[in-house]
Amino acid sequence: MKRHVLLLVFGVLVLVGCASSPEPDHSSRYTLSQDRAPSGNFDASGLADATPRFEEPRRAGNKSPYQVWGKEYHVLGSNDGYVQRGTASWYGEKFHGHKTSNGEVFDMYEMSAAHKSLRIPGYARVTNLDNGRSVVVRVNDRGPFHGDRLIDLSYAAAKKLGYQGRGTARVEVAAITVNRDGSMTLAGKPFPESGAPVDAERLKDPGPGSEALFVQLGAFSQ
């Protein structure tokens, strides 16, 4: 009789333990397994380029070296003078609303980009070598980490360059460096070039206290 009572008590304890144990979290960081373009016909023709401006250097997103999927990457000490050609891809709805590597929130409708080694936040002019179109983007994320791709543009930026349907394009990426006094260089040379039209908004110095402040979180670890 005592043995049956002990077995009954043990069984009850096991059931209680199972009922009180939390369910394993099988949720992913992303709700979509595959990236995709937004639904509907998004018109990017009237979308303005990112406006380069001076931003204080930040630690968030600039850890160097860092590792992704077992591979080590290094962040540049400075973006000044950077220019390189390679393959551009784009990212969209899967990542929309999620945090970037420096703690900002990715918006696929803004002119932004991800790069493996440029310091963030930063700016770059990206030119589609197949059709000559160019855009200016704000680099605030890390990637792409697939194959030999050079840069990931937001869906909006890719559409302005005309390759959103193909998925990738041959591009040239030239870093835009903005100095504290508002002067700029493109791939290490004065920008805009002498004689070129000047966009007053791009040259405007936001002044002390006007620099963007964000909650920043490191995204990668060794």
Regions found by a protein language model. Name each.
Residues 46-64:
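Short acidic, Pro/Gly- and aromatic-enriched capping/linker segments at domain boundaries
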Residues 27-36:
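Mature, extracytoplasmic segments of signal peptide-bearing proteins
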Residues 87, 94-200:
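Exported/periplasmic cell-wall-interacting domains
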Residues 19-22:
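Bacterial signal peptide processing site
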Residues 1-6:
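Bacterial N-terminal signal peptides that target proteins for export
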Residues 207-222:
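Solvent-exposed beta-strand motifs enriched in subsets of small alpha/beta binding domains
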